[in-house]
């Protein structure tokens, strides 16, 4: 009982609400403000509207000072809630001494905080706005002149920081990456894209060159391919992936094009001209993995040591015969290029040449041994393409002949005049 009686006056004397006023919470509020400023540094860049709102809230906090030192709470920052009865009076020394604390506190906060990211350049603006309201709230009107927050120099410095942040916020780009490897990856990706474009251009130019030099023999094409493989970049694509659909010669498949299945996608003009270049004495027997049956086996083995220069010069001198001038041997080579070498013997026995080949229909193909409907459809499609290409070539030759005739007439008229 005695102890309880003693505790009652002790509790009355040392009541926390009376002995420790609200000013004891100033430290926790400052820590909260510092934590909020650190959290603001990790957020997105402030927009113009947010900057205007912060500036207007700071001006409202300055203009709301009454003669009695009462301040209306303009914004929700914890620094604006730092009022206490200690500095409510205009003449109290505690109020005057507390008036000089916020600038030093702001400087210490700015000096202690290392900038974690480029976004922290907006932090002084929020600091200035918050501490400006704090200075206006804590200082009395006579004592507010020495404060650096309410001085004209700070007011002049504050609008300078605001246009800078507005200029920076004018950027519509996303926040800068913290790691330089992201930008490096974008640059390298762009370089690789440009490299792919140049490689595609190089491959198309290479296919054009191969189309122009389709009269070269397989030996010369093999030498060109070997030199390109030795000095080329490892990023170069294989030519049979890019050129097979365009109908150009496959430099990767240097084996005999008459036996390669990759040549099924050739254009008719290309296939017609390519078979015409493959003469009997050009291809060595080692270059063909499949040994065809028929009269071509002896012809291919007749000159196994034919040099590259002789074969290339020889084919450069000879003109390319069109499909109408194909022989039965060239028809057999064309069948081998379509992987239909099993029918080559029947075609050779019946002496089917180029003009007869273009006149073949379904019944004639059946009589030649093409019992498979898929093989007949393939041959019909290729024959149709070759006929269209031959017609196109004939029209182009006629047009060129007409143009030459016109030029000759103009020259004659110019000489007469």
UniProtKB/Swiss-Prot annotation:
Ranges of compositional bias, category Low complexity: 135-153, 244-260, 276-295
All copies of domain SAM, residue ranges: 326-389
Residues the record lists as Phosphothreonine modifications: 283
UniProt keyword list: Coiled coil, Phosphoprotein
Residues forming coiled coils: 377-417
Gene3D superfamilies: Transcription Factor, Ets-1
Record protein name field: Sterile alpha motif domain-containing protein 14
Source organism of this protein record: Homo sapiens
Gene coding for it: SAMD14
């Amino acid at each position: 009982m005695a102890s309880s009686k003693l505790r009652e006056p002790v509790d009355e004397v040392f009541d926390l609400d009376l002995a420790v006023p609200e000013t004891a919470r100033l430290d926790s509020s400052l820590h909260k403000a510092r934590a909020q400023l650190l959290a603001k540094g990790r957020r997105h860049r402030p927009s113009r509207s947010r900057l205007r709102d912060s500036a207007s809230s700071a001006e409202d906090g300055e203009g709301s000072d009454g003669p009695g030192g009462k301040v209306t709470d303009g914004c929700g920052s914890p620094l604006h809630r730092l009022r206490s009865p200690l500095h409510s009076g205009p003449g109290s020394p505690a109020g005057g001494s507390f008036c000089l604390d916020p600038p030093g506190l702001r400087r210490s906060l700015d000096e202690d905080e290392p900038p974690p990211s480029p976004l922290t350049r907006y932090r002084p603006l929020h600091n200035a706005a918050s501490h400006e309201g704090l200075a206006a709230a804590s200082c009395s009107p006579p004592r507010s002149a020495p404060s650096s927050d309410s001085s004209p120099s700070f007011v002049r410095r504050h609008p300078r920081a605001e246009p800078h942040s507005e200029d920076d916020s004018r950027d519509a780009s996303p926040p800068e990456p913290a790691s330089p490897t992201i930008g490096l990856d974008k640059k390298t990706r762009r370089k690789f894209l440009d490299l792919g474009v140049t490689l595609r251009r190089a491959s198309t130019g290479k296919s054009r060159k191969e189309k122009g030099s389709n009269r070269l023999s397989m030996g010369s094409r093999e030498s060109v391919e070997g030199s390109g493989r030795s000095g080329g970049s490892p990023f170069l694509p294989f030519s049979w992936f890019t050129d097979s659909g365009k109908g150009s010669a496959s430099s990767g498949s240097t084996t005999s094009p008459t036996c390669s299945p990759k040549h099924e996608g050739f254009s008719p003009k290309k296939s017609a001209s390519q078979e015409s270049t493959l003469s009997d004495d050009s291809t060595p027997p080692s270059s063909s993995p499949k040994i065809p049956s028929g009269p071509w086996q002896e012809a291919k083995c007749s000159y196994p040591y034919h040099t590259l220069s002789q074969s290339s010069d020889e084919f450069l001198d000879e003109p390319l015969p069109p499909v109408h001038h194909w022989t039965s041997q060239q028809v057999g080579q064309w069948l081998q290029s379509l992987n239909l070498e099993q029918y080559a013997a029947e075609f050779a026995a019946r002496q089917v040449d180029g003009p007869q080949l273009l006149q073949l229909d379904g019944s004639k193909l059946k009589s030649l041994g093409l019992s498979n409907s898929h093989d007949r459809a393939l041959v019909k499609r290729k024959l149709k393409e070759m006929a269209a290409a031959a017609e196109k070539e004939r029209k182009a030759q006629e047009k060129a002949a007409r143009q030459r005739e016109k030029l000759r007439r103009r020259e004659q008229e110019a000489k007469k005049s």
